[in-house]
Amino acid sequence: MAALLGRDLLSLADLTPTELQELLQLATQLKSQQLKLRCNKVLGLLFSKASTRTRVSFTVAMYQLGGQVIDLNPNVTQVSRGEPVQDTARVLERYLDVLAIRTFEQQELATFAEYAKIPVINALTDLEHPCQILADLLTVQECFDSISGLTLTYVGDGNNVANSLMLGCALAGMNVRIATPSGYEPNPQVVAQAQAIADGKTEILLTNDPDLATKGASVLYTDVWASMGQEAEADDRFPIFQPYQISEQLLSLAEPNAIVLHCLPAHRGEEITEEVIEGSQSRVWQQAENRLHVQKALLASILGAE
């Protein structure tokens, strides 16, 4: 994918619909081993937040491409002692070929991208989680004949995953419904971005009614009710979000062949029941595996693997 060579991925809004489809196609080829690519490059991981799937999948993806990985713990770098982001960025660009960053503020990510001359990938911020949604879309594509025109319903907190889902679904030609409690809606600026991408061709619905949002959906999706950094709010959020749990009752309102997704980690008995996450319609483990394949495709495209 020459179009992504040397580029940042800070948001799914950085992609065109064609680039998204080509990225998913490449991920499919790499997953099936129809295509094997190699690149002798170095990936840096700079993660200020805890990570299991993102850290491991990026590391394995880079190793499988023949590259190397350096895990940069911010707590043992000069970043933790107040070194300006722009200084760190201009140093790291001289050692690394690509940098994946997991941090709180989207602006910090943007500053790294502004000052580093190497590609920067958003490995999660409080605003967006683009790599997760690439895996989600690949999973949906694997489960249905055509992704275009399907309806995905997300119930829960209007967080970074909800924000990126709106953008990803709009790019993929999917309808997306976001059901949240009042006051917990997705970021208004991201909503506007997604609406501009959809351009009236697909539905973007925000509602406080999970039943309404779920009726007729082909994909039912949720995430934790309190994201990283919001742990102190968890007890207060529980009664507010309880009606937004994915249960067998809520799932029964979706299409009979609907699938259930969760980006993990899951709090069983809170945002999703044990019966649903372990049930026949759950595709959560397939979804988690696909983090590896889409991120391998992303790295291969950005680094020009051959």
UniProtKB/Swiss-Prot annotation:
Catalyzed reaction equations: carbamoyl phosphate + L-ornithine = L-citrulline + phosphate + H(+)
GO annotation terms (biological process): arginine biosynthetic process via ornithine; citrulline biosynthetic process; L-arginine biosynthetic process
UniProt: L-ornithine binding residues: N160, D223, S227, M228
Residues reported in the UniProt entry to bind carbamoyl phosphate: S51, T52, R53, T54, Q78, R102, H129, P130, C131, Q132, C263, L264, R291
Superkingdom field: Bacteria
Gene3D superfamilies for the chain: Aspartate/ornithine carbamoyltransferase
Keywords: Amino-acid biosynthesis, Arginine biosynthesis, Cytoplasm, Transferase
Molecular functions (GO terms): amino acid binding; ornithine carbamoyltransferase activity
EC number: 2.1.3.3
Family per similarity comment: Belongs to the aspartate/ornithine carbamoyltransferase superfamily. OTCase family.
Designated name of the protein: Ornithine carbamoyltransferase
Organism field: Nostoc sp. (strain PCC 7120 / SAG 25.82 / UTEX 2576)
